[in-house]
UniProtKB/Swiss-Prot annotation:
Role, per record: Catalyzes the last two sequential reactions in the de novo biosynthetic pathway for UDP-N-acetylglucosamine (UDP-GlcNAc). The C-terminal domain catalyzes the transfer of acetyl group from acetyl coenzyme A to glucosamine-1-phosphate (GlcN-1-P) to produce N-acetylglucosamine-1-phosphate (GlcNAc-1-P), which is converted into UDP-GlcNAc by the transfer of uridine 5-monophosphate (from uridine 5-triphosphate), a reaction catalyzed by the N-terminal domain.
The name this protein goes by in its record: Bifunctional protein GlmU
InterPro entries per record: Bifunctional_GlmU, GlmU-like, GlmU_C_LbH, Hexapep, MobA-like_NTP_Trfase, Nucleotide-diphossugar_trans, Trimer_LpxA-like_sf
Cellular compartments annotated: Cytoplasm
Pathway the protein takes part in: Nucleotide-sugar biosynthesis; UDP-N-acetyl-alpha-D-glucosamine biosynthesis; N-acetyl-alpha-D-glucosamine 1-phosphate from alpha-D-glucosamine 6-phosphate (route II): step 2/2; Nucleotide-sugar biosynthesis; UDP-N-acetyl-alpha-D-glucosamine biosynthesis; UDP-N-acetyl-alpha-D-glucosamine from N-acetyl-alpha-D-glucosamine 1-phosphate: step 1/1; Bacterial outer membrane biogenesis; LPS lipid A biosynthesis
Organism: Tropheryma whipplei (strain TW08/27)
Residues annotated as the enzyme's active site: H508 (proton acceptor)
Gene Ontology terms: biological process: cell morphogenesis; cell wall organization; lipid A biosynthetic process; peptidoglycan biosynthetic process; regulation of cell shape; UDP-N-acetylglucosamine biosynthetic process
Subunit structure: Homotrimer.
Length: 601
């Protein structure tokens, strides 16, 4: 049986504050793009479908290649705001396009949807279906002009909304949000409290505790001391969400003053409203009908429709002493939206003004729920995630001597009794088996490290180190290299695209490139494998049991037979047969008293 949950991940933000040519959600933290962390968490919830709303084609390409079961929907460059983002995904929530059925499906979304409610000119909530909760049960259908979406098919009843730039949302929190029944509510959002909420949308509640609206930071008055903020994570009933977005879109397109998007029943009568100058601040008034009498600012009169804090009450009473003066209503949906965008947060107020409840889950893990907008926040987020990763491995049985100087990607796999010394960086698809000692100051990426190996002050990239091998100090193991069991790669050795057999040694100051070295081989100090002729790379083959002298140069392609020896300083250009000794014979010439004759004294 399919899940009734769909997940929409918003990844269409421009990310200008990152000051980067790379899309914000593709910036890495702990080895993966931010959007990948969000998708991995989403998949654990086992939704019937996951939809990513994107703007940059590079985001789509990444998801196609990495998460083939995820649907991608393009948000038009002409449409701004999180509301438009979710609106773009609605048809594909309702369609039969499941990721596991239609992988790599890309859908264009340019607000071409036919709105089947009232015409724009008669957009009146008093007659709209949102004011008739019984009629809402039948739902409203939104479809594309292409006719891809079928109105009579079953579709997910709930939509979980996540943000691709909020990568640390705990799975336990998402699980609670999804499992907790909405009961009489149309949705639920996740909130948190911040000592300094600057920059985040504030959650305003009535004096019964119900969520009434979310106010953007730029619209908060100095008198409003609200530290409960919206994290952006929320779950909504699909039908109600679609209806709300339908209505908000119509009001947005019509460029109305937005007073039509709420009910006007809170005004005593329109004639009771006077002029905007009688409001607390003129800019807060959209129309006179949005005013309420200053004489009626007691909480029991305003609740639950009009949300005014105690600080505003006091200011109003001090500035408007005589009867008949008015205070500006603060609940006109979208009236304070200074940007040309449709915000998803406006649906909260829209629901409230139509008698529909939005629940909340409040968490103390505020640092895990804040978005990434710039490089400072990116670094902070990565540090938080790294601390979590280190703690998890410590609890699993890995000893990490210096958590403060150790960085481990989320994709790394460690085993029990691994010892990580200070200054190590483990990244990519690295896997380290039990008993290995890593560090100090080792960098390992996309590599396999076998049991009981030692890697000290070395860099290893896309390589395989078998059980019992010793690497370093100051060794550089490059891609395509395999170091055999119980082998040794010593100080200042670089190895690239080579196989080193079991119990072989490359102990000192050597470059090994494009080589196959057998077992029980000893490579003398200062050996160079000359593998490049200026156009092509060539291979050197060293058979089992070979011993090479110091300072050898092997000019590839060349083969050295089993058990052969080479003399110090030899340049090996030709193949050497099994068991032979090969020397580059240069007659030594000695000049007596040379230094004295030179005048060295």
């Amino acid at each position: 049986m399919k899940s009734d949950l769909a997940i929409v991940i918003l990844a269409a933000g421009r990310g200008t504050r990152m000051r980067s040519s790379t899309p914000k959600v593709l910036h890495n933290i702990a080895g993966l793009p931010m959007v990948a962390h969000v998708l991995r968490g989403a998949q654990l919830l086992k939704p019937c479908k996951t939809i990513v709303v994107f703007r940059d084609v590079r985001v789509e390409q990444y998801i196609r290649n990495t998460f083939p079961d995820v649907l991608t929907v393009a948000q038009s460059d002409a449409l701004y705001g999180t509301g438009f983002g979710v609106f773009s995904a609605i048809p594909w929530i309702r369609s039969e396009s499941y990721g596991n059925t239609y992988p790599n499906t890309r859908h264009e979304s340019h607000a071409e949807y036919e709105l089947d409610a009232c015409d724009l000119d008669t957009c009146n909530p008093a007659s709209d279906r949102l004011n008739d909760q019984e009629s809402l049960k039948g739902g409203r259908h939104i479809h594309t002009k292409s006719g891809d979406v079928t109105n009579n098919k079953p579709f997910p009843s709930r939509v979980l909304i996540l943000y691709a730039d909020v990568p640390l949302v705990p799975f336990q929190l998402l699980e609670e949000l999804v499992r907790k029944p909405l009961k009489q509510a149309v949705g639920a959002i996740v909130t948190t409290h911040l000592d300094n909420p600057k920059g985040y949308g504030r959650v305003m509640r009535d004096n019964l505790g119900s969520i009434a609206k979310i106010i953007e930071d730029s619209n908060i008055l100095p008198e409003q001391s609200i530290n409960e903020v919206n994290t952006g994570v929320g779950i909504f009933d699909t039908e109600y969400l679609q209806d709300a977005l339908n209505k908000l879109l119509k009001c947005h397109i019509a460029h109305s003053p937005n007073q039509d998007c709420v009910t006007n029943q809170d005004c005593v009568t329109n004639q009771d409203c006077v002029t905007n100058q009688d409001c607390v601040t003129n800019q807060d008034c959209v129309t006179n009908q949005d005013c309420v009498p200053a004489a009626h600012t007691e909480a029991h009169v305003l609740s639950p429709k009009v949300i005014v804090t105690e600080q505003i009450h006091k200011k109003a009473e001090s500035e408007h002493q005589h009867a008949g003066q008015w205070m500006c209503r603060q609940d006109t949906v979208g009236a304070q939206n200074t940007k040309e965008e449709m915000r998803l947060t406006d649906i909260v107020e829209y629901f409230y003004n139509n008698g529909l409840r939005v629940n909340s889950i409040t968490t103390s893990d505020s640092e895990l729920l804040l978005g990434v907008n710039n490089r400072v926040q990116l670094a902070k987020t990565e540090k938080i995630l790294n601390d979590q990763i280190i703690k998890r491995w410590q609890l699993y049985g890995v000893t990490i001597k210096s958590p403060e100087t150790t960085w481990i990607d989320s994709t790394v796999q460690l085993s029990e009794d691994v010892l990580i010394l200070p200054g190590c960086i483990l990244s990519g698809r690295t896997r380290i088996e039990e008993g290995a000692v890593i560090g100090p100051f080792a960098t390992i990426s996309d590599s396999f490290i076998g049991k009981n190996t030692i890697v000290k002050r070395a860099e290893i990239i896309d390589a395989r180190i078998e059980e019992g091998a010793v690497i370093g100090p100051f060794a550089f193991i490059r891609p395509g290299t395999v170091i055999g069991k119980d082998s040794k790669v010593g100080t200042f050795v670089e190895i690239k695209q080579s196989n080193i057999g079991p119990e072989s040694k490359v102990p000192h100051l050597s470059y090994i490139g494009d080589a196959n070295i057998g077992s029980h081989v000893n490579i003398g100090a200062g050996n160079i494998f000359a593998n490049y002729d200026g156009k092509l790379k060539h291979e050197t083959c060293i058979d089992d049991g070979v011993k090479t002298g110091a300072g050898n140069v092997f000019v590839a392609p060349v083969k050295v037979g089993r058990g052969a020896y080479t003399g110090a300083g030899s340049v090996i250009r030709d193949d050497i047969e099994e068991g032979a000794l090969s020397l580059t014979e240069l007659k030594q010439k000695t000049i007596p008293k040379w230094a004295e004759n030179r005048g060295d004294g």
